[in-house]
Amino acid sequence: MIFAKGHGTENDFVVLPDLDAALSLTPSAVAALCDRRRGLGADGVLRVTRAGAARAAGVFDRLPDGVSAGDWYMDYRNADGSIAQMCGNGVRVFAHYLRASGLESADEFVVGSLAGPRPVVLHGFDPARATTAEVTVEMGKANQFGAGSAVVGGRSFDGLAVDVGNPHLACVGITADDLAALDVAAPVSFDPALFPDGVNVEVLTASVDGAVSMRVHERGVGETRSCGTGTVAATVAALAHDGADTGTLRVRIPGGEVTVTVTESTSYLRGPSVLVARGELDPHWWHAVAG
């Protein structure tokens, strides 16, 4: 049972090539795999398969809107084993893995997800330097759906609710010094009526010279070094804070920097991907943790 390990701005993933979608990704198996002491350690798991194979295996009952049976499909699981609709950093790593492993020969193709199709572009990919890549993902339209508040690190923040294929509350206005000192790892509280399935919470500075700084508490994970969909939500909120609906911002997260462009009809996330390891999981260990 082979695997790869990669990260997008230090949001790290275990990649499991499983073209027939035959693996039993139980919550207990995913949680063990992502545990940094008893497994490989990661913020999530990316199963590499085709959408048609995932449907046939019962991963979902019907193809997500806009996704074809022949499309690559990113079956993404959070570190606690729960299923997530979308992960922007994960799509970059997923696309990079496909190209670096030879499963995909084109530099532009579509990655399917529960949130729908995500077109990707690998910029100047060099097979001789396949461990690194620069990838743009078309993330779709980011939709605002209200205002809310959250308590993070003992402080209350007002924010903008944004749907990027998954729910976010992006809270603009903290100073850079206060952001650095904020305890984002602690559990957060939020309005369950607005976010019945939980929410990813971003706390960020207002934009200065075309850039913001952000930290994120991801549902099912806790604080991560980066969150791709979160950077899109943060950009939408920062632009709205400045009275704009569209624009481009650089978003600085603890794991690095990405560039997000928001248009009237869609959004784009561009950033790095790094593949750091390949290996083989012990089948006896896997069967033991899969339950």
Swiss-Prot record:
Primary location recorded for the protein, binned into one broad class: cytoplasm
Pathway, according to UniProt? Amino-acid biosynthesis; L-lysine biosynthesis via DAP pathway; DL-2,6-diaminopimelate from LL-2,6-diaminopimelate: step 1/1
Q: What are the EC numbers?
A: 5.1.1.7
Q: What superkingdom heads the lineage?
A: Bacteria
- Keyword Chloroplast in record: no
One GO molecular function term of this record is: diaminopimelate epimerase activity
Q: Where is the active site?
A: 87 (proton donor), 227 (proton acceptor)
Q: Which key words tag this protein in UniProt?
A: Amino-acid biosynthesis, Cytoplasm, Isomerase, Lysine biosynthesis
GO annotation, biological process: lysine biosynthetic process via diaminopimelate
- According to its UniProt record, this protein's enzyme class is isomerase
One Pfam family hit: DAP_epimerase
Coiled coil (residue ranges): none
Q: Site feature Could be important to modulate the pK values of the two catalytic cysteine residues: at which residues?
A: 168, 218
Name the catalysed reactions. Answer: (2S,6S)-2,6-diaminopimelate = meso-2,6-diaminopimelate
**HAMAP family, per this entry?**
DAP_epimerase
Q: Quaternary form?
A: Homodimer.
Function of the molecule: Catalyzes the stereoinversion of LL-2,6-diaminopimelate (L,L-DAP) to meso-diaminopimelate (meso-DAP), a precursor of L-lysine and an essential component of the bacterial peptidoglycan.
Q: This protein is called what?
A: Diaminopimelate epimerase
Q: Which organism is it from?
A: Mycolicibacterium smegmatis (strain ATCC 700084 / mc(2)155) (Mycobacterium smegmatis)
